[in-house]
A protein has these predicted regions:
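RNA-contacting regions in translation and RNA-metabolism proteins
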Residues: 1-313
Length: 313
């Protein structure tokens, strides 16, 4: 071979050995096929479970990843068990997650097939799970004789000294049907199934009413209410008068009962001692609060008008 110099062209044979080339091609082909198979499986899972978003499923604990519980959910397409993720914030404090144990879960979302990890995002703390559990246990709900109007749930209370609790408001259009009794069942048989599934969570089933005073009074169950005053209907603010011996029950441990009642009804609820209530002073306080809120809004409300726009006459 002639000696090469700077600027010369050199031709080299870089053809791989036949065996090496065949092995590399086989590995690449296998990887491509495996990826396509995984993509197709995830697409099938997505198509199957999207229709079940907002409903309950049964999952079996497979393993733990970081602070999430990975569950196996049955697939109706003959696929292997589909994995679902139960994040820490969706877990119940009273649950004991052990490998092989089964739980009812609420399917919140089916993730896109292109994403990594479990495609199903499930919850044990969603109010939707309570609705689904009652729907499964109460035939009158399935038959649309009883309807669930509202649910307020505190599955993970801010304090460990307070347990999970749910308030559920029910109603019926049938005069001969007791919606509360239908949900509770004979000797509490129906509601007990739901309570057991939620590991002893306290559940209050109350009667919904179109009358705000009655609805608020029912929502504060089991406390005995003397009077409900709608002191600011536009602002949905109410004063609830109770006997002194009912104050702690109406408010609840660390305010949980009144907090859930407010969320259930959509009203701001102030619990007052009936014996010490001064209606004139109370209304003056409400009016003062209303004026303060109005001044705050007028002072700090941003001006959304576009400086470049022209008002039409």
């Amino acid at each position: 071979m002639m000696p090469t110099q700077i600027g010369d062209s050199v031709i080299l044979d870089v053809t791989p050995e036949r065996d090496d080339f065949g092995r590399m091609a086989a590995i690449q082909a296998k990887q491509v096929l495996a990826q396509k198979l995984r993509d197709q499986q995830r697409k099938i899972i997505q198509e199957e479970f999207e229709q079940f978003e907002g409903s309950s499923l049964t999952g079996k604990v497979l393993r733990f990843e970081r602070q999430s519980v990975i569950l196996a959910v049955n697939s109706s397409f003959g696929q292997p068990d589909v994995e679902a993720e139960l994040p820490q914030q969706e877990q119940l404090p009273n649950d004991n997650y052990r490998i092989g144990r089964t739980f009812k879960v609420f399917l919140k979302k089916v993730r896109e097939g292109s994403q990594r990890g479990p495609q199903l995002l499930v919850s044990r703390g969603s109010a939707g799970l309570v609705v689904e559990l009652f729907a499964n246990e109460v035939p009158e709900i399935e038959e649309e004789l009883v309807r669930i109007v509202a649910v307020a749930r505190e599955a993970s209370p801010p304090s460990r000294h307070v347990g999970p609790r749910t308030k559920i408001a029910v109603d019926t259009l049938e005069g001969d049907v007791d919606p509360v009794g239908a949900c509770i069942g004979a000797r509490g048989s129906r509601i007990q199934v739901v309570v057991n599934e939620l590991q002893g969570e306290k559940i209050d089933v109350i009667r919904w009413s179109p009358d705000p005073s009655t609805y608020i009074s029912n929502a504060l169950s089991p406390a005995r209410i003397d009077e409900v005053r709608l002191v600011n209907p536009d602002g949905r603010q109410a004063h609830v008068l109770v006997p002194e011996d009912q104050l702690s029950l109406a408010i609840g441990k660390e305010g949980q009962n009144v907090r859930l009642a407010a969320r259930l009804t959509g009203w701001k609820i102030d619990i007052k001692d009936a014996a010490k209530y001064d209606p004139i002073a109370a209304m003056a306080e409400v009016e003062s609060q209303r004026q303060a809120e109005s001044e705050y809004q007028s002072r700090y409300r941003p001006d959304y008008q576009d400086a470049g726009s022209v008002d039409e006459e």
